[in-house]
Amino acid sequence: SVSVVEREEIPKGFTLVNGLPDVGLVGVLAVSHLVSSLKMEEVGSIESESLPPLVVLHGGLPRSPIRIFLKDSLAAIVSETAVPSEAVYSLANAIVKWAYSKNAKLVISVGGMAVQNRQNIEKPKVFAALTDESLIEMLGASAEVLQEGYMVGPYALILKKCLDSEVSGVTLLAQSFYNYPDPEAAAAVLESLEKITGI
């Protein structure tokens, strides 16, 4: 099972941004940058026996590999470890259940979408998948709605569970390299995130 541990009380009504390891490490790069640039405070973690037996060290101190940060009404989840396939369902479920219990205004997952000709793309485009059409207006010109296709992995399940729980959810995916880190894709997705949230 997966549990969300709040080290201190997290106020309700936040916007939640998820950065999990994925294609081009786009989500982790983008949300880690967000956390450091906004000086977000670490307020909790996600714990599970299904996750690899590891801790990350920051300032010499052990930390959970999946941590929760907060600044004003913006919360962020960053994972510094890949999520094993056997933990994906329970992790997605725990994140959305927690967001629902906290009356989250919006759950935004950010990541990459591998494209073959990435080296020829100067500025990666950002695409969006949404839980409902009313969010299209909010997107504006920040991202192009993915009309057809499919998604796999944690973000697919988070979006589906948001839909099932009637939590507003958006997944932002930037065109990226498949097999190595893509900071330009992370920058593109951050730009879209800034337009949507006004951060």
Give, region by region, the residue ranges found by the protein language model.
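Catalytic cores of processing enzymes, dominated by hydrolases/peptidases
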Residues: Q116-I196
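Secondary-structure boundary elements
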Residues: E41, V96-V107, L163-S168, I196-I199
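Internal, conserved structured core segments that host functional sites
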Residues: S85, Y89-L135
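Short, solvent-exposed amphipathic alpha-helical segments in soluble enzyme
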Residues: S32-S36, A92-I95, A187-L190
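Surface-exposed cleft-lining segments at the edges of enzyme active sites
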Residues: T81-P84, V145
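Short beta-strand segments
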Residues: N18, I77-V78, S109-G111, L173-Q175
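Gly/Ser/Thr-rich loops at beta-strand to alpha-helix junctions
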Residues: L20-L25, V83-E86, G112-N117, Y178-Y180
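N-terminal short beta-loop-beta anion/metal-coordinating cradle
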Residues: S1-T81
